[in-house]
Amino acid sequence: MLVKVFSFFILMIIMVIGVSKEYCDDKQSCQNLLLELKAGSSSLSEIRRRDLLIIVLKNSVRRIDMAMIGVMDDTKQHEEMENDMLGVKEDTNLFEEMMESEENSHTWLSSVLTSYITCIDEIGEGAYKRRVEPKLENLISRARVVLALFISISLRDNTELISVIPNGPSWLFHVDKKDLYLNAEIADVVVAKDGTGKYSTVNAAIAAAPQHSQKRFVIYIKTGIYDEIVVIENTKPNLTLIGDGQDLTIITGNLSASNVRRTYNTATVASNGNGFIGVDMCFRNTAGPAKGPAVALRVSGDMSVIYRCRVEGYQDALYPHSDRQFYRECFITGTVDFICGNAVAVFQFCQIVARQPKMGQSNVITAQSRATKDVKSGFSIQNCNITTSSDLDTATVKTYLGRPWRRFSTVAVLQSFIGDLVDPAGWTPWKGETGLSTLHYREYQNRGPGAVTSRRVKWSGFKVMKDPKKATEFTVAKLLDGETWLKESRIPYESGL
């Protein structure tokens, strides 16, 4: 019997690793991980594809969790890093629920890898980095291998799929069905500068929100300019901020890379909680074009929705950092890489507006940072208008649709208006030839003077799509798995093309 079990598992290894080199670059690491899992499993003779997925995921979470202990011991002397690691560790507590769907599991694993890479990017230099970096690299390596195995197993046989929850996981849009088109009578708490609300600051209202709640908590923010740095912790899911309008309710700050070491922490508003919804307000960073990265809004929680909001900044203005996000009817303006990050994000019916950058700079709309082919991430810009602000001198400043922050950067521009501000090349390199053959840049049925593709870049990673089936891969239904969760948000959306 033991011989049978072992032989079966070796067969599974051959099947999984043999799916193709395309899905597991480091075959030895994948095989070693599977052998680790075999040693801890007692009944593999009856294993099915779904069971193998669960074994891989559960055991990997446990091993990643153990590996994190060593990193966190070192980060106790570094408050920012410790908070980041605690955030990732907190996310593992949701994993049992996330496993109820392959889509959720893939998103979660991608998010974990994104968090590790963000940490190592922003550690800085010196003795601390030399001590912590090897441990973080170990975490990144393990997360990459787990992702590769996950993809390989998932693609083996789609006749037995893990069931997808009809309306998203229980922590999102729970039994309460509070309508998003709110007023002060329906909101849980009201923020007002004039004293007519329970709180006068946004931070005070967020502090009052319950932790780990499965019910939605709605904060209505009345007209006013709120000069404060707002951080929504990942212990506060299902939070809604709703204002009186994107020109009336404004949260503003001016942190930048010139006075805060990490781009990640420059955000005027940072949401780390799953199920975040922002409606009818403005997120602003006034640091200016000369101060470097300065984020107005960073979103790091899964199944987040930004609706009818204004995001206003310069470099790195909007930072869709990780997980699934949906932006609808928003006004987004900036200069260099002003939509950047590693989220799975779809933008529909948004105004994307390039403004005047620092002298000598070019504008770049997107800097998507998908690091490996197994990570689930990418930006889709659908039915949007890409235009210029009145202050942009298009005669002297070039504007591009995007550049690859990392090798597998993924961006699609679909059915959108592209103004004449966009350079005929369309896209620009990050550094030399890096990523030009591995990125995924796509355009489909765009219009406007900047949509002409005859002079676009000749990179092998760039394509003009003709087949609607291929373009469909970048829609809400396919890219976001939006049909399983967006409808409960009551935000309008287009599922397909």
Curated annotation (Swiss-Prot):
Protein location: Secreted, Cell wall
Keyword Hydrolase found: yes
Molecular function GO terms recorded: enzyme inhibitor activity; pectinesterase activity
GO biological process terms held by the UniProt record: cell wall modification; pectin catabolic process
Top-level taxon of the source organism: Eukaryota
InterPro entries: Pectin_lyas_fold (IPR012334), Pectin_lyase_fold/virulence (IPR011050), Pectinesterase_cat (IPR000070), Pectinesterase_inhib_dom (IPR006501), Pectinesterase_Tyr_AS (IPR018040)
Name of protein: Probable pectinesterase 30
Pfam families: Pectinesterase
